[in-house]
C-alpha cells in the first residue's frame, strides 16, 4: 500500500494543501499544543526582534504531520519577513542553493523541508552561509579555477526533518535552536479540530470534535483530514450536522478504529502476533510479511504504535505488547 493512500497517513496530499493553508495558524497566539516549544519560540523571537537581529537558525524534528511547516510559517510571520520554501531532494546542485541564498532579503526565513536529504555537495555550500553569512563560489575550471566569496544578508535557516539522526554532525551543530515536536494530546487536537471546523463553517459539536481528535493518532494533519471526510459523510447522511454519533459512524465507515488504527496498523500488529508469535521479529522480516517498505514502517507506521505502547523495540527486533493483544481481544500464550 502506498503511504499517501492511507486516510490516516501523516504525509500531505496535494489537493489538501490549499485548504490546509486556509486553516493553518499564522501566529504563536493561534498555535495550539507543544507548550514548551511555543514558550521558547516566543522568547527567542521577541529577543531577536528587540536586538534587530535575524532569528538564530532553527531545526525542527519529529514525526510527520505535527506542524513543522506551520511553525516555519509562524516564525516568518512573527518576524515580519519573507518565507522562502524548498526541500532537500529539490536542491540537487550547489547552484540551486546558491540561487535561493542570493535572493534572500535581510532577516528572511529559508525553510528546507526534509533537510536530511541534502546532498553532501549542497551541504558544504550551506556551512559558511549559516555560520558566516557567506557564499563560496567556484569560478572557472581546471587550473584556472578560483574561489570567490559573496556576502549574504543575515537570514534564518529553518530545517525540518523526520529523521534528525540522519543529519551530519557539522550540519546539526550549526543550528542554534533545536525543537522536537511531540504527538499531540487529545484535548489539544480537539481544540485544533474545532478551530478548523469554524474556519470551514461546519456545524460540529464538542463531542463530534472529540471523536475526531481521539482517532487522529496525535497528529493535527490526520485530524484535519479526518474532519474533512466526516464532513462529507455528514453532508450526505446527516444534513451537515456533525455530532458525536455522526462522527463515530463516519469514522467506523472509514475503518479507523477507536485507537486511530487503520488497516495497515492492524495488519502490522497482527503480523507480529500471528506470524511471529508476538516477536521479536526483525524489521526486514516484518516488512516482507506485510508487503511494506522498512522505511515506511520505521518512520510512519511504527512511531505512534510504540509511543502508545502497542509495540516494543528490543535488540532482537519488534515485539507486540500485552496492550496489543488486548486490543484484538487476545491473550498472550506464555
Swiss-Prot record:
Top-level taxon of the source organism: Bacteria
GO molecular function: ATP binding; ATP hydrolysis activity; four-way junction DNA binding; four-way junction helicase activity
UniProt keyword Nucleotide-binding, yes or no: yes
UniProt key word Hydrolase: yes
InterPro entries, A to Z: AAA+_ATPase (IPR003593), AAA_lid_4 (IPR041445), DNA_helicase_Holl-junc_RuvB (IPR004605), P-loop_NTPase (IPR027417), RuvB-like_N (IPR008824), RuvB_C (IPR008823), WH-like_DNA-bd_sf (IPR036388), WH_DNA-bd_sf (IPR036390)
Cellular compartment(s): Cytoplasm
Residues that, per the record, bind DNA: 294, 313, 318
Keywords, in A-Z order: ATP-binding, Cytoplasm, DNA damage, DNA recombination, DNA repair, DNA-binding, Hydrolase, Nucleotide-binding
Region (Large ATPase domain (RuvB-L)): 4-184
Known function: The RuvA-RuvB-RuvC complex processes Holliday junction (HJ) DNA during genetic recombination and DNA repair, while the RuvA-RuvB complex plays an important role in the rescue of blocked DNA replication forks via replication fork reversal (RFR). RuvA specifically binds to HJ cruciform DNA, conferring on it an open structure. The RuvB hexamer acts as an ATP-dependent pump, pulling dsDNA into and through the RuvAB complex. RuvB forms 2 homohexamers on either side of HJ DNA bound by 1 or 2 RuvA tetramers; 4 subunits per hexamer contact DNA at a time.
Subunit text: Homohexamer. Forms an RuvA(8)-RuvB(12)-Holliday junction (HJ) complex. HJ DNA is sandwiched between 2 RuvA tetramers; dsDNA enters through RuvA and exits via RuvB. An RuvB hexamer assembles on each DNA strand where it exits the tetramer. Each RuvB hexamer is contacted by two RuvA subunits (via domain III) on 2 adjacent RuvB subunits; this complex drives branch migration. In the full resolvosome a probable DNA-RuvA(4)-RuvB(12)-RuvC(2) complex forms which resolves the HJ.
HAMAP family: DNA_HJ_migration_RuvB (MF_00016)
Entry-linked PANTHER family: HOLLIDAY JUNCTION BRANCH MIGRATION COMPLEX SUBUNIT RUVB, PTHR42848
Domain free text: Has 3 domains, the large (RuvB-L) and small ATPase (RuvB-S) domains and the C-terminal head (RuvB-H) domain. The head domain binds DNA, while the ATPase domains jointly bind ATP, ADP or are empty depending on the state of the subunit in the translocation cycle. During a single DNA translocation step the structure of each domain remains the same, but their relative positions change.
Protein name: Holliday junction branch migration complex subunit RuvB
Organism the protein comes from: Serratia proteamaculans (strain 568)
Amino acid at each position: 500500500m502506498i503511504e499517501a493512500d492511507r486516510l490516516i497517513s501523516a504525509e500531505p496530499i496535494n489537493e489538501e494543501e490549499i485548504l490546509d493553508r486556509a486553516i493553518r495558524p499564522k501566529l504563536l497566539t493561534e498555535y495550539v499544543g507543544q507548550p514548551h516549544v511555543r514558550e521558547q519560540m516566543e522568547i527567542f523571537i521577541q529577543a531577536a526582534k528587540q536586538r534587530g537581529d535575524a532569528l538564530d537558525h532553527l531545526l525542527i524534528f519529529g514525526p510527520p504531520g505535527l506542524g513543522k511547516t506551520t511553525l516555519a510559517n509562524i516564525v516568518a510571520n512573527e518576524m515580519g519577513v519573507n518565507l522562502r520554501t524548498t526541500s532537500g531532494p529539490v536542491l540537487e546542485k550547489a547552484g540551486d542553493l546558491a540561487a535561493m541564498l542570493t535572493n534572500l532579503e535581510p532577516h528572511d526565513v529559508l525553510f528546507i523541508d526534509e533537510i536530511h536529504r541534502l546532498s553532501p555537495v549542497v551541504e558544504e555550500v550551506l556551512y559558511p552561509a549559516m555560520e558566516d553569512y557567506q557564499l563560496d563560489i567556484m569560478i572557472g575550471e581546471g587550473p584556472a579555477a578560483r574561489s570567490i566569496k559573496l556576502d549574504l544578508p543575515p537570514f534564518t535557516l529553518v530545517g525540518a526533518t523526520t529523521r534528525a539522526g540522519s543529519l551530519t554532525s557539522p550540519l546539526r551543530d550549526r543550528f542554534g535552536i533545536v525543537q522536537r515536536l511531540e504527538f499531540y494530546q487529545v484535548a489539544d487536537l480537539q481544540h485544533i479540530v474545532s478551530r478548523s471546523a469554524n474556519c470551514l463553517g461546519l456545524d460540529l459539536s464538542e463531542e463530534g470534535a472529540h471523536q475526531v481528535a481521539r482517532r487522529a493518532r496525535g497528529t493535527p494533519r490526520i485530524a484535519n483530514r479526518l474532519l474533512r471526510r466526516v464532513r462529507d459523510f455528514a453532508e450526505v447522511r446527516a444534513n451537515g450536522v456533525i455530532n458525536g454519533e455522526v462522527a463515530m459512524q463516519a469514522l467506523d465507515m472509514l475503518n479507523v478504529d477507536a485507537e486511530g488504527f487503520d488497516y495497515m496498523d492492524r495488519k502490522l500488529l497482527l503480523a507480529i502476533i500471528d506470524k511471529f508469535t508476538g516477536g521479536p521479529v526483525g524489521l526486514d522480516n516484518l516488512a516482507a510479511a506485510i508487503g511494506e517498505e522498512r522505511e515506511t514502517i520505521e518512520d510512519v507506521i511504527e512511531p505512534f504504535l510504540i509511543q502508545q505502547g502497542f509495540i516494543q523495540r528490543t535488540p532482537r527486533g519488534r515485539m507486540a505488547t500485552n496492550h496489543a493483544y488486548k486490543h484484538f481481544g487476545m491473550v498472550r500464550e506464555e
